[in-house]
Amino acid sequence: MTRPAEPARAAGRHRPRKRLGQHFLTDQRIIDAIVQAIAPQPGQPMVEIGPGLAALTQPLVERLGRLTVIELDRDLALRLRRHAHLQVIQADVLRVDFTALAQTLRATPPTPPTRLRVVGNLPYNISTPILFHLLAHGSAIEDQHFMLQKQVVERMVAKPGGSDYGRLSVMLQWRYAMEKLLHVPPASFAPPPRVDSAVVRMLPHAQPAAVSRPMLEELVQLAFSQRRKLLHHTLGRWLDAHQYAGRFDTRRRAEEVPVQEYLDLAREAHRWIADGKDPPCAGA
């Protein structure tokens, strides 16, 4: 098995590209802790997003036997292809169909018929779009372990009532049970980012609430569009415009509403409109 160079030395030979948000993990203690948290087992179908200089890739593939990686950087993808046990997909991760990829990997012996495990040190400049992209593929994914900006992780796992609780919290908690695993300081990277990082574990709910994603996204976006105002001035206007007659207290701020209440509202509002109770468009 061809083994990449030790992380710190490898980072010194590659010029990080700012436009790709490249910060390479070099702290071996952190690498070991992440691998221990992931606990890869031989034969498991795993996909790593943004492998970079293979600091995490190498210990993972040693335990798995084979690993699929998604890398946008052409030079890094070329380097990774020298590794006999890596399947390299050079692509923008936002264009990757993870459901189709899971089906492909299931059909590749000796991989057993199971869901994907997805890991990665996500580029901080597009981490939220990646998380939302993966929402659509939750049924094909077993779990996710990501390195992210610490502030983003805190928003992901936030509970109602605090300033960190927002649109990201609601949308992700709808589909995942999440846990912040460890803090990663800037000095663990080359070059060091200007922010602290953290590792999060994301376990898709076996039976997420059956709601219309577009409806939920619209309601949550409206609710948090003006955080300081009561929902009566934002989401309440939408409900009034659609003549919604259900029970939902708009005398609160968006951050005070639990995830389950947003889910219930999305389900009821979608049914209300589908039943033809929505008023006709102007001029109809």
UniProtKB/Swiss-Prot annotation:
SUPFAM superfamilies: S-adenosyl-L-methionine-dependent methyltransferases
Domain of life: Bacteria
InterPro entries reported in the protein's UniProt record: KsgA/Erm (IPR001737), rRNA_Ade_diMease-like_C (IPR023165), rRNA_Ade_Mease_Trfase_CS (IPR020596), rRNA_Ade_methylase_Trfase_N (IPR020598), rRNA_adenine_dimethylase (IPR011530), SAM-dependent_MTases_sf (IPR029063)
Catalytic reaction(s) noted: adenosine(1518)/adenosine(1519) in 16S rRNA + 4 S-adenosyl-L-methionine = N(6)-dimethyladenosine(1518)/N(6)-dimethyladenosine(1519) in 16S rRNA + 4 S-adenosyl-L-homocysteine + 4 H(+)
Keyword annotations of the record: Cytoplasm, Methyltransferase, RNA-binding, rRNA processing, S-adenosyl-L-methionine, Transferase
Protein location: Cytoplasm
Enzyme class of the recorded protein, top EC level: transferase
GO cellular component, as recorded: cytosol
Binding site for S-adenosyl-L-methionine: H23, L25, G50, E71, D92, N121
GO molecular function: 16S rRNA (adenine(1518)-N(6)/adenine(1519)-N(6))-dimethyltransferase activity; RNA binding
Stated role: Specifically dimethylates two adjacent adenosines (A1518 and A1519) in the loop of a conserved hairpin near the 3'-end of 16S rRNA in the 30S particle. May play a critical role in biogenesis of 30S subunits.
Similarity remark: Belongs to the class I-like SAM-binding methyltransferase superfamily. rRNA adenine N(6)-methyltransferase family. RsmA subfamily.
Protein name: Ribosomal RNA small subunit methyltransferase A
Classification of source organism: Bacteria, Pseudomonadati, Pseudomonadota, Betaproteobacteria, Burkholderiales
